[in-house]
C-alpha cells in the first residue's frame, strides 16, 4: 500500500509538471494543500467519478481557483474523465483544464472560481440549497438529501469583502454541512501577508457563529482527519478548519515564499523537489499502485448504489414527493407550466392596471409562485421596496430551512454569488433583488453567472432618475447598458404588467443564463395589445403602435419611457405624421431574432429614428444610427422630485415631439 505522503506527492508532482509544461500557473497552493486534499478526497468525500452529477454527492469547491492544478490532479487521479493528456494541456486553447477551474469543462468542477472569495460564497449557496432541499423532502427514516459542501480557500479569499458577507450569513443560517479549509500559509503575491492581513481569523469566524478548529498541521494526515471528523460531527454550525501549511511544500528552495505562488518552479527546482519528496518518476508519470490507491470509481459507484436503494424506499413510501424531487433536481418545469402561464399573461392583458412595474413583478411572482415550489427568493434587505415577497413566501432560517425566501441582509455581492451556488446545486429557481444602482456591488457575480451559464434571476428596481429625491447616488444611469453588454446576460426593462410577466416567464424558463429584470418605482400606464403583439413581447422588440404604410419615423423606447413614446406618437399622428412605436424591453432577445423579423420591426429604409430611455444615451446608436437621435442620459442625475427630473433631462412629450419634427424637417 502506498503511503499517504506518496499519494499526496502525486498531486504535487502533477501540479509542478502541469505548470511547468504550460510555462504559467500557480504551483504553490496545490503543493501546500496536497496533504489536506488527499485525506479529504480519499477518506471523506462522497462522490462518483462515473457519475459526476449524482444528486446527493458531496460538493467540493476550490475557492482559491488559481491553484487549479490541485483539482485537476484530484479529478484525474480519482478516475474522472480527465486524462493525463488533459493535464498536459493545462492552460491551452480549448482544453478541459483552463487556467482557473471552469464549470462545464472538466467533469467534477462544481463552479468556476478565480475571482477570490466567490468560491466560498458559491459554496454557501450550495450548503443553503442542501439544507433547504433536505428540509423540504426528507422524511423520518428517509434522508435522501444528506451531503456536505467542502471548500478550500486561501488568505486572498478571506481578504475579499465578499467572504465577510457570505460567511456571516452562513453562520446566521447555521449551515452545519458546510466545512471550509483555510490554507493558512502566510503568503500572497506581494510576499508575507502580515503586513496587510493581520486579522485573528479564528476569532473572526467564531464571531460569525462558526465552529472553528484552529492550528491544524496541514501536513499531518492524522491531524487533518481528526479535524474533518470533528467538523462533520458539528451539525448546527458551519466549520472552519484552520490548516497551517507551507506554500510549495516539497520545493527545497522556494517553499514558504511567494516565489512559488504564481510562476513555474523551473526544471532545476522541480528536479530538486522530486529528490526532496522521494518521487522518482518522470514528468506526468504516475505508478500503477498510486493510481490504484487513488481510484474512487468502485467506491463511488457503491455509494451511489446505496443511495439509489434509499431513494427507491423513499419513492415507495412517498411517491408524489419522490416524483417532485426528481423533477426539481432535473430542472424541469411543472407539466402545466406553459398553459397556466399563457393564461395568466392573457388575463393580465385583458385586465389593465396602471401600476409600477415593480408591483407588476410582484404580481407575476404571486401568479407564477403558486406553480413553482422550487422558487427560492430573496432580497438584499429591500423586500418592501423590491416587492419580492408574495403570499407564499416563507422565510428560511437556521431553525426552519423549509422556507423559500432568504433574507440576505445588505449583502448584494454575497447574495448574487450565493444564488449562483444555489443554482449550481440544483433543485431551485433562485432569484434575488436590490436597487438597480446597487447591482454595481454585485456585478462580478452576475458576470460569473453569465460565464458559467447558470440561472440567476435578479430583480433590479428603482431603475432610473424616476427614483427622484434620493438623488444621483441612488439613480442608475449606465447600469442597464453594462448589463446588456455582458455576454450571455438576458436583460429586460418592461413597460407594464404584461411585459413584466413575460419577462418573468422567460427568465424562469431560461436555465442556461442569468436574467436581469429591471423595474420602475413609479406607476406606468398599461398598453393595449393584440394577441399577436403579446406573443411578440418574447422577441424582445415589437411594433406597439403603427401607421398606414411605411413609417417616416420610428420611436424606440423601453420601460417607463414607452408611454412617453406613445403620447408623442399620438400627437404626431394627429398632425399627419407617419410614425411607428417600437417597444424594446430586451435588446438581447431582439438581437437574436432572424433578420426578416428585425427588418420588419426596424426597416433599414427608415433612417429617422429616436430612441428614448432614461439610461445612458450612447448604447442606442446601434439602433438609431448616427443619423438618428437619442433622448437619454449623458450625465448623472440630481436630487429632486421625479417629475421635475424627467422634465429637466428632456423626458417629456413636448421634447420628443420637438426632436421628431426637427428630424423630419
UniProtKB/Swiss-Prot annotation:
<keyword id="KW-0460">Magnesium</keyword>
<feature type="binding site">
    <location>
        <position position="156"/>
    </location>
    <ligand>
        <name>thiamine diphosphate</name>
    </ligand>
</feature>
<feature type="binding site">
    <location>
        <position position="155"/>
    </location>
    <ligand>
        <name>Mg(2+)</name>
    </ligand>
</feature>
<feature type="binding site">
    <location>
        <position position="185"/>
    </location>
    <ligand>
        <name>thiamine diphosphate</name>
    </ligand>
</feature>
<dbReference type="GO" id="GO:0006098">
    <property type="term" value="P:pentose-phosphate shunt"/>
</dbReference>
<comment type="function">
    <text>Catalyzes the transfer of a two-carbon ketol group from a ketose donor to an aldose acceptor, via a covalent intermediate with the cofactor thiamine pyrophosphate.</text>
</comment>
<keyword id="KW-0479">Metal-binding</keyword>
<dbReference type="InterPro" id="IPR020826">
    <property type="entry name" value="Transketolase_BS"/>
</dbReference>
<feature type="site" description="Important for catalytic activity">
    <location>
        <position position="26"/>
    </location>
</feature>
<dbReference type="InterPro" id="IPR055152">
    <property type="entry name" value="Transketolase-like_C_2"/>
</dbReference>
<dbReference type="InterPro" id="IPR033247">
    <property type="entry name" value="Transketolase_fam"/>
</dbReference>
<feature type="binding site">
    <location>
        <begin position="114"/>
        <end position="116"/>
    </location>
    <ligand>
        <name>thiamine diphosphate</name>
    </ligand>
</feature>
<keyword id="KW-0106">Calcium</keyword>
<dbReference type="InterPro" id="IPR005475">
    <property type="entry name" value="Transketolase-like_Pyr-bd"/>
</dbReference>
<dbReference type="GO" id="GO:0004802">
    <property type="term" value="F:transketolase activity"/>
</dbReference>
<dbReference type="InterPro" id="IPR005474">
    <property type="entry name" value="Transketolase_N"/>
</dbReference>
<dbReference type="GO" id="GO:0005829">
    <property type="term" value="C:cytosol"/>
</dbReference>
<dbReference type="GO" id="GO:0046872">
    <property type="term" value="F:metal ion binding"/>
</dbReference>
<feature type="binding site">
    <location>
        <position position="66"/>
    </location>
    <ligand>
        <name>thiamine diphosphate</name>
    </ligand>
</feature>
<keyword id="KW-0786">Thiamine pyrophosphate</keyword>
<feature type="binding site">
    <location>
        <position position="187"/>
    </location>
    <ligand>
        <name>Mg(2+)</name>
    </ligand>
</feature>
<feature type="binding site">
    <location>
        <position position="261"/>
    </location>
    <ligand>
        <name>substrate</name>
    </ligand>
</feature>
<feature type="binding site">
    <location>
        <position position="358"/>
    </location>
    <ligand>
        <name>substrate</name>
    </ligand>
</feature>
<feature type="binding site">
    <location>
        <position position="462"/>
    </location>
    <ligand>
        <name>substrate</name>
    </ligand>
</feature>
<dbReference type="Pfam" id="PF00456">
    <property type="entry name" value="Transketolase_N"/>
</dbReference>
<feature type="binding site">
    <location>
        <position position="521"/>
    </location>
    <ligand>
        <name>substrate</name>
    </ligand>
</feature>
<feature type="binding site">
    <location>
        <position position="438"/>
    </location>
    <ligand>
        <name>thiamine diphosphate</name>
    </ligand>
</feature>
<dbReference type="InterPro" id="IPR049557">
    <property type="entry name" value="Transketolase_CS"/>
</dbReference>
<dbReference type="InterPro" id="IPR005478">
    <property type="entry name" value="Transketolase_bac-like"/>
</dbReference>
<feature type="binding site">
    <location>
        <position position="26"/>
    </location>
    <ligand>
        <name>substrate</name>
    </ligand>
</feature>
<dbReference type="InterPro" id="IPR009014">
    <property type="entry name" value="Transketo_C/PFOR_II"/>
</dbReference>
<comment type="similarity">
    <text>Belongs to the transketolase family.</text>
</comment>
<dbReference type="Pfam" id="PF22613">
    <property type="entry name" value="Transketolase_C_1"/>
</dbReference>
<feature type="binding site">
    <location>
        <position position="385"/>
    </location>
    <ligand>
        <name>substrate</name>
    </ligand>
</feature>
<feature type="binding site">
    <location>
        <position position="470"/>
    </location>
    <ligand>
        <name>substrate</name>
    </ligand>
</feature>
<feature type="active site" description="Proton donor">
    <location>
        <position position="412"/>
    </location>
</feature>
<feature type="site" description="Important for catalytic activity">
    <location>
        <position position="261"/>
    </location>
</feature>
<feature type="binding site">
    <location>
        <position position="261"/>
    </location>
    <ligand>
        <name>thiamine diphosphate</name>
    </ligand>
</feature>
<feature type="binding site">
    <location>
        <position position="185"/>
    </location>
    <ligand>
        <name>Mg(2+)</name>
    </ligand>
</feature>
<keyword id="KW-0808">Transferase</keyword>
<dbReference type="InterPro" id="IPR029061">
    <property type="entry name" value="THDP-binding"/>
</dbReference>
<dbReference type="Pfam" id="PF02779">
    <property type="entry name" value="Transket_pyr"/>
</dbReference>
